[in-house]
């Protein structure tokens, strides 16, 4: 909340950021298969994301915020080579080669620094990377692989939120759309479980989210310690409801993290 009050713009502002990445690998992309090899020199370049942001103040208390994300150049037909099944034949798949997504679109009512309200499409602050997903907030070229494999990233859902500051604590409480169990996989847990395959999002069983940060460690100015909590009953949000009819499997996520930024920067 303190960040929103300190933003300083009077009416509207534009912003954004982007990432360009280059990687070098000394192994084949399919090195774990019999056809692959663990010894191959190759390099890649990509534009993982480009974000455009816009904020508008209807009044000092009502603020509209939006972000549009372009991933890997936007949407298009992805082409793949069927190396084994079809002897290298090229196919045009009905897949998205990249993505254009409305990452944020919400209205905030700034009542005071302690209690504020938000309505719309917003970031789900579960885990360090989702809560602080801008490129300057992680050390590597890419976002931390462990967290972005197990959890959606960037995770954004539609709902309502309360947020504010209480002394050295800042908090956010959300009720947002839940996950689709059809996206759960053994190899990436709930990382692919966000809804979005259809125009409408199921809200039968919403998710409950809480995040708290503490910034009052006196011996280490610049240290922030945080924790987040997520609870959802995703069976009613299934994109294949007959398959999950009558099933109940609650999903609970608890995370803890810390981040240090030098006060001299």
Where do the language-model regions lie?
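Solvent-exposed loop segments that connect transmembrane elements
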Residues: 30-40, 76-96, 180-199, 235-249
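Outer membrane beta-barrel
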Residues: 3-25, 40-181, 204-209, 213-220, ...
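Detector for outer-membrane/organellar transmembrane beta-barrel domains
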Residues: 218-265
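Glycine/serine-rich loop-strand microenvironments at binding/catalytic pocket rims
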Residues: 163-200, 224-226, 248-249, 255-260
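Accessible peptide chain termini
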Residues: 1-2, 265
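Active-site glycine- and acidic-residue-rich loops that bind
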Residues: 153, 199-207, 245-253
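Loop-centered beta-sheet repeat module
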Residues: 189-238
């Amino acid at each position: 909340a303190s960040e929103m009050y300190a933003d300083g713009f009077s009416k509207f502002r534009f912003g954004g950021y982007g990432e360009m990445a280059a990687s070098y690998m000394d192994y084949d992309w399919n090195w774990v298969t019999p056809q692959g090899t663990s010894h191959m020199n190759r390099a890649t370049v990509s534009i993982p994301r480009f974000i455009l942001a816009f904020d508008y103040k209807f009044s000092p208390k009502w603020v509209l915020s939006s972000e549009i994300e372009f991933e890997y150049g936007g949407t298009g037909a992805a082409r793949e080579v069927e190396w084994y099944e079809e002897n290298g034949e090229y196919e045009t798949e009905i897949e998205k080669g990249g993505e254009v997504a409305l990452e944020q679109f919400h209205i905030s009512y700034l009542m005071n620094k302690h209690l504020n309200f938000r309505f719309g499409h917003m970031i789900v602050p579960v885990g360090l990377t989702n809560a602080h997903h801008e490129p300057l907030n992680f050390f590597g070229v890419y976002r931390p692989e462990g967290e972005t494999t197990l959890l959606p990233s960037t995770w954004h859902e539609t709902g309502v939120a309360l947020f504010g500051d209480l002394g050295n604590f800042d908090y956010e409480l959300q009720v947002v759309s839940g996950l689709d169990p059809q996206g759960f996989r053994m190899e990436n847990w709930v990382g692919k479980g966000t809804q979005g395959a259809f125009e409408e999002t199921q809200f039968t069983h919403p998710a409950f989210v809480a995040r708290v940060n503490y910034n009052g460690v006196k011996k280490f100015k610049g240290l922030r310690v945080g924790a987040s909590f997520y609870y959802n009953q995703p069976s009613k949000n299934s994109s294949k409801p007959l398959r999950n009819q009558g099933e109940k499997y609650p999903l609970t996520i608890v995370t803890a993290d810390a981040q240090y930024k030098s006060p001299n920067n």
